[in-house]
Every structure is written in C-alpha cells, then in structure tokens.
Curated annotation (Swiss-Prot):
Name assigned to this protein: UDP-N-acetylenolpyruvoylglucosamine reductase
Annotated PANTHER family: UDP-N-ACETYLENOLPYRUVOYLGLUCOSAMINE REDUCTASE
Alphabetical GO biological process terms: cell division; cell wall organization; peptidoglycan biosynthetic process; regulation of cell shape
Catalytic activity: UDP-N-acetyl-alpha-D-muramate + NADP(+) = UDP-N-acetyl-3-O-(1-carboxyvinyl)-alpha-D-glucosamine + NADPH + H(+)
Domain FAD-binding PCMH-type: 13-183
Domain of life: Bacteria
Cofactor (UniProt): FAD
Length: 342
C-alpha cells in the first residue's frame, strides 16, 4: 500500500510514499519517527512541501508537521512571538500585521510552514528570517529531548542553517521564536519598494507592494505547480563579479558584507533567452525566469532535465554555475541537488 505525495508537494509531481502521517503534536511526531526507524524505513518531516522536488517514490514514512499555535508576549521594546512549526508562514505575516506588529511584511506570500523558515533562512526583498528570529525550539528525534537554539546557534547563512547541516535528520523543529522590534525600520531596497518614501511608508504599504510584486511575477502553485525560486541567487567573488560587469554593465548585483557579490539568477537566465523554454511537461516561467513550473503533467525527470539545461546555458554564457534552492528528495532521503543537475 502506498500513498500519493501529489497533494503534499506544490510542484504537483505524482510520486508515492510508503506511509504518510499527519502529526498534530510533538508526541505524534516523535512516535511516527520512532516507529519508522524501528521498521528500518527512511523517514522525513515535511511542512507544506513548497521547497522540495520528489525525484522518485519515497520508500519510507513522510511525517506532515502540523503543530499549531501562536503566543505573543509584549515587552517595552518588542513583541515576542512563539509560533508552532505547522502554522502557515503567510498567515503568520498577516496575523502580525493585523495585530499591529510590523517587521515581517517583506516576507509576505513566501509559501510554506513556519517550521521550514529557519531551515532555509527564508528571505525576500532585502529581509531574511535571521533578522527577526530569536530562537528555534526543536526536539531530538532519537531521545525526545527538547532543545532551544538561539539565532546565533542556528548559524544562519544565505538559504542555509545548522538544520541543513549537522542537525539535518537529527532534530524536528517544533516552534520558532520571533522578536519584532517596536522601533520598526522599513526595508525598501528591492523592486517596487524603492519607490516608497521611508519617511511616510507604513508596514501595510510594504506588505501590499510585496504581495503585488509576488502575485504579478510568480505563478500560483494551484494553477501551475512550482516550488518558487528554483535556483539560489549565486554569490561570487568580487573579481568574478567585476569581470562579468565589464561585459554586462547593467547586470543587477548586490555587494555583500564579506566583499563577495550576489548576482540575480533570474536575470542571468533571462539573458539566455530561456523564458518559456519547455522540456516535457516542465517549463521556465514566462514572467519570472527563476521559477520552473509544472506546465503540463511534468515528471520529475522533466524538471531535472530542464534545470540541467538552464544551468548549462547560464554557465556557458557567464561562467557562473547555478545551484538549486529547491531540495531534491530521492528514494530514501535528500540527495545532492547540484550533482543531480550537473
């Protein structure tokens, strides 16, 4: 007996898992994990499946993290939110704004669960989770022991954290603590946000602008399956960036604190005239080249072949090699996404 994963991944790719368990509390999550381990099955914890590509049928148990709840504590200088890992991220952004607690608005409409946000250190329009993260509560899967990691202990990087490294498959995230400062500072560095006046802008205006940009540029997974940005924006050494800017002076680029330079993957793909290109049922989105979509009953092989094609074209033109932001899941767990498309 197998169970379809199609409803549980936003790419809408039709693979199956041996078992799918919905965990609404910590105990259910732990017992499902321990049961699978006793049976010698691979096991993975999934939020809303908005950042994964299943490459084949999964030979084990998929646990859906549905731990809910939002608690708010107010201090003189901040609001402190303790949020269950299974809460929807965008609903949390709206909840905070509706209750006059700004600070999350740049991260509006990012798909997925709150518990997935620290794994990727989600970010958009100049703000990353690490800016507002206070702590992450986890449970050790083998022992059931609770751990609270401070933001510093999470070792956040660009789309990276300790949860993608040492703690991968060792812990489950059960809640995330956020600190929203009462000294709200708008971040207006990207896209349409640069047109807003920092002196008069409200958090609601930032939220509305972000939602407008995302809905006009990004496809709705309910219409065309996708996992948002398929590739990371590449971060390159300063000399490589200089070389590229000599050849392409209008290339968007964002100097980083450590001297490296972040490039815009979507722009690089667009310059290779790849918008609308299809392989099988997979396509490069026509509005936002960074997004690969399930345009017509795509298989995972179609998506991988298209990602390979995009990576090759960009690499040949710019000598910059893109890496997937989406996580690739094989028969018994995560596999190296770069190797899969190289």
């Amino acid at each position: 007996m197998t169970h379809s994963l199609k409803p549980w991944n936003t790419f809408g790719i039709d693979h199956c898992a041996k078992h799918i368990v919905c965990a609404e509390n910590e105990q259910q999550l732990l017992s499902a994990w321990q049961q699978a381990t006793r049976e010698g099955l691979p096991v993975m914890i999934l939020g809303e499946g908005s950042n994964v590509l299943f490459l084949e049928n999964y030979a084990g148990t998929v646990i859906l993290n549905r731990l809910k709840g939002i608690e708010v504590n107010e201090t003189a200088d901040a609001w402190h939110l303790h949020v269950g890992a299974g809460e929807n991220w965008h609903q949390l952004v709206r909840y905070a704004l509706d209750n006059n607690m700004p600070g999350l608005e740049n991260l509006a409409l990012i798909p997925g669960c709150v518990g997935s946000s620290p794994i990727q250190n989600i970010g958009a329009y100049g703000v990353e989770l690490q800016r507002v993260c206070d702590y992450v509560d986890c449970v050790e899967l083998e022992t059931g022991k609770r751990l609270r990691l401070s933001a510093a202990e999470c070792r956040f990087g660009y789309r990276d954290s300790i949860f993608k490294n040492e703690y991968q498959d060792r812990v489950a995230i059960v809640a995330v603590g956020l600190r929203l400062s009462k000294q709200w500072q708008p971040v207006l560095t990207y896209g349409d946000l640069t047109c807003l006046d920092p002196k008069t802008v409200t958090a609601q205006q930032v939220f509305d602008a972000v939602c407008h940009m995302r809905t006009t540029k990004l496809p709705d997974p309910k219409v065309n399956g996708n996992a948002g940005s398929f590739f990371k924006n590449p971060v390159v050494a300063a000399d490589i960036a200089m070389e590229l800017l000599e050849r392409f002076p209008n290339a968007p680029h964002y100097p980083q604190a450590d001297g490296s330079v972040k490039l815009a993957a979507g722009w690089l793909i667009d310059q290779c005239q790849l918008k609308g290109v299809t392989i099988g049922g997979a396509a490069v989105h026509r509005q936002q080249a960074l997004v690969l979509i399930n345009a017509n009953d795509a298989t995972s092989k179609d998506v991988v072949a298209l990602a390979h094609h995009v990576r090759q074209k960009v690499g040949e033109k710019f000598n910059v090699w893109l890496e997937p932001e989406v996580r690739f899941i094989g028969r018994s767990g995560e596999v190296n996404a770069v190797e899969s498309i190289a």
